[in-house]
UniProtKB/Swiss-Prot annotation:
Assembly, per entry: Efficient DNA binding requires dimerization with another bHLH protein.
Keywords recorded for this protein, A-Z: Activator, Developmental protein, Differentiation, DNA-binding, Neurogenesis, Nucleus, Transcription, Transcription regulation
The keyword Transferase is assigned to this record: no
Protein name: Neurogenic differentiation factor 6
UniProt function note: Activates E box-dependent transcription in collaboration with TCF3/E47. May be a trans-acting factor involved in the development and maintenance of the mammalian nervous system. Transactivates the promoter of its own gene.
Gene Ontology MF: a single term: DNA-binding transcription activator activity, RNA polymerase II-specific
Biased composition regions of type Acidic residues, renumbered to the chain: 54-71
Gene3D superfamilies in the record: Helix-loop-helix DNA-binding domain
Electron transport is among the record's keywords: no
Domain bHLH: 94-146
Domain of life: Eukaryota
Length: 337
């Protein structure tokens, strides 16, 4: 029996043919791939309609992406800084001009509306112009005040109306509103929470209540003092009058009837009213100025004298002294009769 050695060329001749055919097919596919890809791009470009501005931008992006490196390798895809061309610069400049024109027209319309609002709001001045925020705040307060009038159905007090009108406004704007309504700005002082403190003698405000001191009344058991010579409660506004030699614009100071007018007081600070000590004080006068309301144990005689501890009776370190001999004589005559 003859035996033949195993030979691949003889036994498997078809395998080599299959290998050659498969290699040829792969080469043909590699050649056909770029052609089909280019055809697809052309077909898509024909089927899709693009705007002229978008076409230029997308074409530039595709060109940038399709560019190759120096080594022939494709570059990485992604956003990169675009090349500055004349068309692109003109396009950017035109867009910027349109945006500026829109903003300018918007600001002109806003300023015109604010000017019309300033004419309606109760605040007019030829020299001073309200700011935008102050105009809006005043308009809001004005609308709210008018709505309150309609809700209540009654005519409000002028001072209350102005206080509601000036809530949250600055001091210059408050002065303008008060001047427009012919009202003194000192008559209302706006607080932090919108509350006002009244310090005026106008018909729209309330007066200060007088300071009643029980120590200044007539001592019990001494009813010989005439009612015409009795002293009224002391008001601290007299310190303002004695210092400035004029009547205080903020409050009314009561006066003592008859010869018992309050002696002048020296003003040495905002919260302290002290007398000026002199070397001759006590030498020219036999009797002191300070009297108390405590009744003595014995009968009231000519030699009796009352001394008043002023620190316990008058707050803010207030002391009174006489500056004229006639005033001292009249006071002594009243208290020793």
């Amino acid at each position: 029996m003859l035996t033949l050695p195993f030979d691949e060329s003889v036994v498997m001749p078809e395998s080599q043919m299959c290998r050659k055919f498969s290699r040829e097919c792969e080469d043909q596919k590699q050649i056909k791939k770029p052609e089909s890809f280019s055809k697809q791009i052309v077909l898509r470009g024909k089927s899709i309609k693009r705007a002229p501005g978008e076409e230029t931008e997308k074409e530039e992006e595709e060109e940038d992406r399709e560019e190759e490196d120096e080594n022939g390798l494709p570059r990485r895809r992604g956003l990169r800084k675009k090349k500055t061309t004349k068309l692109r610069l003109e396009r950017v400049k035109f867009r910027r001009q349109e945006a500026n024109a829109r903003e300018r027209n918007r600001m002109h319309g806003l300023n015109d509306a604010l000017d019309n609002l300033r004419k309606v709001v109760p605040c007019y001045s030829k020299t001073q112009k309200l700011s935008k925020i102050e105009t809006l705040r005043l308009a809001k307060n004005y609308i709210w005040a008018l709505s309150e009038i309609l809700r209540i159905g009654k005519r409000p007090d002028l001072l209350t109306f102005v206080q509601n009108l000036c809530k949250g406004l600055s001091q210059p704007t408050t002065n303008l509103v008060a001047g427009c309504l012919q009202l003194n700005a000192r008559s209302f002082l706006m607080g932090q929470g919108g509350e006002a403190a009244h310090h005026t003698r106008s018909p729209y405000s309330t007066f200060y209540p007088p300071y009643h001191s029980p120590e200044l009344t007539t001592p019990p058991g001494h009813g010989t003092l005439d009612n015409s010579k009795s002293m009224k409660p002391y008001n601290y506004c007299s310190a303002y009058e004695s210092f400035y030699e004029s009547t205080s614009p903020e409050c009314a100071s009561p006066q003592f009837e008859g010869p018992l007018s309050p002696p002048p007081i020296n003003y040495n600070g905002i919260f302290s009213l002290k007398q000026e000590e002199t070397l001759d004080y006590g030498k020219n006068y036999n009797y002191g100025m300070h009297y108390c309301a405590v009744p003595p144990r014995g009968p009231l005689g000519q030699g009796a004298m009352f001394r008043l501890p002023t620190d316990s009776h008058f707050p803010y370190d207030l002391h009174l002294r006489s500056q004229s001999l006639t005033m001292q004589d009249e006071l002594n005559a009243v208290f020793h009769n």
